[in-house]
C-alpha cells in the first residue's frame, strides 16, 4: 500500500475499499506488520482493527496524540464497536508505555463519541462499571453534533443538570442555528434571558429569523438589551431581521455611536423613520451633519423636513 496520512485515506476512500484493505491483514503475518510499522513510523493502521491494535504495546515509536485521535474518530464514525471494546478492556498496559493514550480513556472517548453523535458508543461508555464519566460534562459536545438522541440520553440518564450548563448548551445551539436543540433545551429549563439575553443575541448574529421569532414567542426580553440587539442586527446589515425587529416595536437609540454610524453609512432611512414614528428622541442635527459628510441625501431631506416642521 502507498503510505498516505490516515485522515486523507479515510476521507478519500470508499468504505468497501477500506474493508478490502483491512482484509489483507489476515494474509500478512503480524511480525511483518510490526516491522513495517517500526520502519515507517506509521502507527495509525494499528489503531483501526482489533487484531493489529494488540501490536501497539510492542511498537518502538510514539504516535502524536492527534494521530491517535484521527484513528479513534474513525472507529467512532464507522461504529467499530469491537475495536472500541478492545480499547476499553485495556488488555495491555498502554498507560504505562504511552501515557498520552490516557487521553483516549474513557472520558476522552466519551468526548469524541458525543462530538460525533454516536449514541450506541455513548451508551457503551456510560455502561462501564466504576466509570468516572459525568454525562453532563459532555452536553456541549452532544449539542455541537446536533444529535438530539444523544442530548436526550444525557438528560434522561444524569439527573439534575445544573442551570449554567443548560444555558451554555442553549448558547451553543444558537450559534449553530439548531432549532430542534433550542426547543428541547428550553423545554428542559434553559433560561432564554440569562446573561443579558446572550442566547437571543447569538441568534441575532446568525440572522436566523425562524429562531429569532421562536425566542420572541418564548418571551425573550429583547427591549432590555436593545442596544446590543441592534448592534448585531447592523453588523453586518440583516435586512429581514431589521424589518422584523421594527414590527415588534423594538426600542432603538440613534444617539448610540455603534447604531448611528452603520445607519448613516448604509443609508437605512427606514430605521430613522421608525425612530421618529415611535417618538424616540435623538440628535437630529448631528445626524444631518454626518449625513451631509457622507452625502446621504434621503436622510438629509427627511430629517430637515422634520426639523423645519418643529420650528
UniProtKB/Swiss-Prot annotation:
- Key word rRNA processing present in the record? no
Which InterPro entries does the UniProt entry name for this protein?
A: Ankyrin_rpt (IPR002110), Ankyrin_rpt-contain_sf (IPR036770)
Keyword field: ANK repeat, Repeat
Q: Repeat: is it a keyword of this entry?
A: yes
SMART domains linked to this entry: ANK
Gene3D superfamilies, A to Z: Ankyrin repeat-containing domain
One Pfam match, given by its short name, reads: Ank_2
Q: Which residues form a coiled coil?
A: none
Q: Where does each ANK repeat begin and end?
A: 67-96, 105-134, 136-163, 165-194, 195-224
The record's disulfide annotation reads none
Please name the PANTHER family in this protein's record.
Answer: ANKYRIN REPEAT PROTEIN, GH09064P
Task: Write the protein's name.
Answer: Putative ankyrin repeat protein R825
What is the source species? Acanthamoeba polyphaga mimivirus (APMV)
